């Protein structure tokens, strides 16, 4: 599971008050309220890239494939807009990353980060749960290291 540092762009995430559903049920809504800042955008881009491949593996993997880091990322890791399913995969990935960041850095949930890492193809979205977020209500609680649960939906 990847551990993420808080990206600078999350300071742009603001809550919108007064949003209600058609039955007058209040909704928790958030939006990006941003000012163009290249340093923050660069930090955000790096944050997104780290969802796919950790820094410690990137240079080694590129070298093993006899590619520059940029070539390796484009050819094998990051969905590209000119490829079949590339735009859809990019859009889905960024949406999942945005929601994971909202849950982790704004709402203070624990969010495992592994969906984009080691998937079967850069333009293929893995099937299953998009985001898992959890929180312990008692201070100092942690999951037992010898206990894990797996839930799987099966047909028929």
Regions found by a protein language model. Give the residues of each.
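Mixed-charge (Asp/Glu-Lys/Arg
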Residues: 1-127, 132-156
């Amino acid at each position: 599971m990847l551990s993420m540092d808080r990206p600078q762009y999350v300071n742009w995430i603001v809550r919108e008050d007064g949003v209600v559903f058609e039955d007058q049920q209040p909704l928790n809504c958030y939006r990006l309220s941003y000012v163009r800042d290249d340093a923050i955008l660069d930090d955000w881009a790096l944050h997104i890239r780290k969802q796919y491949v950790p820094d410690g593996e990137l240079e080694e993997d590129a070298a093993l494939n006899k590619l520059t880091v940029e070539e390796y990322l484009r050819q094998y890791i990051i969905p590209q807009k000119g490829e079949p399913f590339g735009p859809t995969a990019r859009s889905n990935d960024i949406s999942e990353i945005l929601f994971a960041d909202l849950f982790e850095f704004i709402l203070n949930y624990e969010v495992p980060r592994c969906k984009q890492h080691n998937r079967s193809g850069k333009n293929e979205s893995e099937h299953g749960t998009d985001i898992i977020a959890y929180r312990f209500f008692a201070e100092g609680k942690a999951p037992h290291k010898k206990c894990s649960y797996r839930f799987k939906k099966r047909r028929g």
